[in-house]
């Protein structure tokens, strides 16, 4: 049995009880408890990126069965979620199978979600929201090479471009407690992690392919390709009907800008020198994404886009059994703004691009140097700079924050053992998206201050 209690000021807190029963090849898990999530959204008033204004309290209970059968592992799960404040109830079910074979492994998962909202004493009718999701992945090993591929098709709650980001009124959205399958390659570099793409469980079709293999006895190569889009291509009306949207279904990722496409190509080389005391990792990354579909009519096509090119480098030197030094450098070039095309009946279309920044290209640099002693002590110095910071364009930016386009920090940490670590930090952090273990969360900027972190793992 397990009792869990955790509450965070600006994330997700939970209290609950978990029980597990094992017998032969079967495992049953039962959970029950409540979850409180806090987010900040522009849909509601009093928006402040550092202060939550949207609160959701849920009571959950469910069970999961896992069974080893015919050299495979099959599983089924259901989860019931109640939200009293919003008079909402959700039912989630899942079926999955994991089957290893001689030269690889296959995994498949299907999920369904039903959301019902009670109208209470009002005459408002709330339709039942039904959503589904499918995910499959396959890994194959050929001599020293491996290839992994996956396909996902999530349609938990598909909404048109005018309402898709309204987390308050879209009561059929995927829940915060739902987690998407992790990507094959998780970026360990600062700038690349910040530009990672989160899987949209509500509406996304995607594929991923990764190829890994040796180039020599000391060097390896990794090729990663990701492509995803909305499950629909969206079209807007004209004139008085400009706010009305329609869509055509996509069953494979689309490159059409009206489908919120995302595409990433990442190539990495890594390995050791002949003496084995120097490890290197260097790569190239290209990303393209359409964030918003503003208009896609016979008159005007307008999209918010982002392109980035990143060069990451990491070198680790083992000086002796006690000391090692690591150097990390990232160079990034970003283009973000609005692409607009005004269509003409005479064939002379007007194309334009409006940058979201004062410059056409944002240039980011991140440099970090760390030293480790005896696997106990670590010392870190980092510096990040840009020629234009998009956060400074927000009129609600707190005036107490430094408007300089650079962030520097120094930290020292001591590891008492594998479960106890103490860190003292001074300086600034730019903030942004941070993805670890397949979960992404937004880190708020930290400006010229002191932070003390103590982490403890309790078995």
Question: Positions of the model-derived regions?
Answer:
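Outer membrane beta-barrel
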Residues: 1-37, 138-161, 431
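Short Pro/Gly-enriched beta-strand edge/turn motifs at strand-loop
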Residues: 2, 47, 192-193
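Alpha-helix capping and helix-loop boundary segments enriched in small/acidic/polar residues
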Residues: 7, 52-56, 125-126
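Hydrophobic, small-residue-rich alpha-helical packing segments that form membrane-like cores
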Residues: 15, 20, 28-89
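Secondary-structure boundary elements
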Residues: 21-26, 66-71, 99-104, 214-218
């Amino acid at each position: 049995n397990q009792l869990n209690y955790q509450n965070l000021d600006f994330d997700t807190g939970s209290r609950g009880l978990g029980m597990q029963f094992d017998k032969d090849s079967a495992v049953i898990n039962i959970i029950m408890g409540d979850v409180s999530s806090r987010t900040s959204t522009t849909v509601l008033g009093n928006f402040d990126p550092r202060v939550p204004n949207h609160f959701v309290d849920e009571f959950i209970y469910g069970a999961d069965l896992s069974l080893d059968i015919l050299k495979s592992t099959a599983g089924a799960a259901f989860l019931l979620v109640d939200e009293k404040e919003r008079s909402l109830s959700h039912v989630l079910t899942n079926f999955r199978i994991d089957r290893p074979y001689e030269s690889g492994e296959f995994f498949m998962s299907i999920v369904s979600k039903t959301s019902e909202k009670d109208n209470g004493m009002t005459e408002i009718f709330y339709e039942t929201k039904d959503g589904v999701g499918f995910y499959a992945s396959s890994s194959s090993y050929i001599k020293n090479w491996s290839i992994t591929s996956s396909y996902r098709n999530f349609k938990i709650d598909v909404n048109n471009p005018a309402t898709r980001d309204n987390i308050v009124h879209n009561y059929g959205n995927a829940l915060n407690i739902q987690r998407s399958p992790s990507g094959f390659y998780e970026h360990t570099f600062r700038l690349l992690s910040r530009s990672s793409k989160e899987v949209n469980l509500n509406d996304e079709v995607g594929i991923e392919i990764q190829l890994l293999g040796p180039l020599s006895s000391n060097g390896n190569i990794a090729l990663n390709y990701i492509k995803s889009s909305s499950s629909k291509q969206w079209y807007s009306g004209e004139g008085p009907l400009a706010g009305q949207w329609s869509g055509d279904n996509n069953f494979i990722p689309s490159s059409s800008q009206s489908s919120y496409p995302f595409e990433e190509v990442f190539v990495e080389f890594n390995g050791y020198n002949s003496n084995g005391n120097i490890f290197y990792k260097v790569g190239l990354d290209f990303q393209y994404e359409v964030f918003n579909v503003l208009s896609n009519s016979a008159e005007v096509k307008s999209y918010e886009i982002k392109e980035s090119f990143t060069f990451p480098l990491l070198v680790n030197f083992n000086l002796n059994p006690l000391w090692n030094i690591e150097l990390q450098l990232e160079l990034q070039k970003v283009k973000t703004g609005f692409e607009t095309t005004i269509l003409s009946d005479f064939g002379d279309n007007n194309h334009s691009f409006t940058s979201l920044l004062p410059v056409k290209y944002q240039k980011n640099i991140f440099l970090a140097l760390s030293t480790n002693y005896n696997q106990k002590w670590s010392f870190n110095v980092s510096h990040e700079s840009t020629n234009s910071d998009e956060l400074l364009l927000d009129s609600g930016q707190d005036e107490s924050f430094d408007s300089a386009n650079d962030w520097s920090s120094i930290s020292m940490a001591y590891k008492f053992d594998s479960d106890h670590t103490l860190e003292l930090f001074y300086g600034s952090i730019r903030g942004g998206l941070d993805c670890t273990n397949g979960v992404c969360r937004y880190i708020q900027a930290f400006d010229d201050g002191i932070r003390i972190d103590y982490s403890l793992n309790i078995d």
